[in-house]
Amino acid sequence: MQLGMIGLGRMGANMTKRLEDHGLDLKTYDPKVDSTASTLEELRDQLDAPRTFWMMVPAGEITEQTFQTLLDLAERGDVIVDGGNSNFRDSQRRCREAKQRGIGFVDCGTSGGIWGLSVGYCLMVGGEDDAVAQAEPAFIALAPDDGYAHVGGPGAGHFTKMVHNGIEYGLMQAYAEGFEVMEKSEFDLDLHEIAGIWRYGSVVRSWLLELLHAAFEKEGTDLEKIHGYVEDSGEGRWTIAEAIAEDVPVPVISAALFARFASRQDESFAAKVTAALRNQFGGHAVKAVQTAEAATQDPR
């Protein structure tokens, strides 16, 4: 099978290597690194019809621009796969737009990160049967045994990956809170050792726990060189928004997202308001902000 890979970042480059290792003929395009094609048009011309293109670019504007360009370049019978973290509503729309031109569209939720090259990628695939079938040799090559499924129609792949990432937020937050309780305890606990033994036979064993054990090994258990500032890439927000639309309570995922928001605050205005209110209604003491001038005054 021939495949046109668009985007050779960490994920795209590793996926390209895994596909080639499994015997696929890869043509590539990335304006920032060496690739077989210098333009998307040249990439199209390097592939035999019917073509399969795989977009592995950042979600949002770049994905939309790439998709629209491919729509103009592709021919009837070609298939476009989006392996990034696009919003499933955008994927449904893109499938409709592609179908109007006789072009297939497949949304593929991809999990595995930088480890996927060696162990394979979990693939959650959405799309119509004929389009999925055309791209299936690539899915089989990329995934480990039992790690790929056609989960539903257009949008279903990215919807499933969205929820996957929402769950991931909750799992990481639970580990983070538990290890902080242990770190603050009266016991001199070796967190690296505990993360290690929990990997074997424990109810809470997981790949995330293995990664945490590796992080403690690399960074030390105090993590003193890491600032506790946590970004989010959007999927947690989308999961919560969809849960609200479906009247589904998701308190754990919501709390995990809000904890990330809190991690980015140098000072919480909400906490200031609460402190001010307690002072007003009960005369409770407040802790004054120490200004730079006050900090440099002679304490005598």
Question: Where are each of the predicted segments found?
Answer:
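NAD(P)+-binding Rossmann beta1-loop-alpha1 motif at the extreme N-terminus of oxidoreductases
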Residues: M1-R51, L73-G77, I114-G116, N279
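Conserved dinucleotide-binding and phosphotransfer motif residues
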Residues: H22, R101, E246
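Hydrophobic beta-strand scaffold residues
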Residues: L26, G104-V106, V250
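Rossmann-fold NAD(P) dinucleotide-binding segment
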Residues: L40-V106
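Rossmann-fold dinucleotide-binding core
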Residues: T66, N87-E177, S185
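Helical "substrate-binding/catalytic lid" subdomain
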Residues: Q134, G155-H284
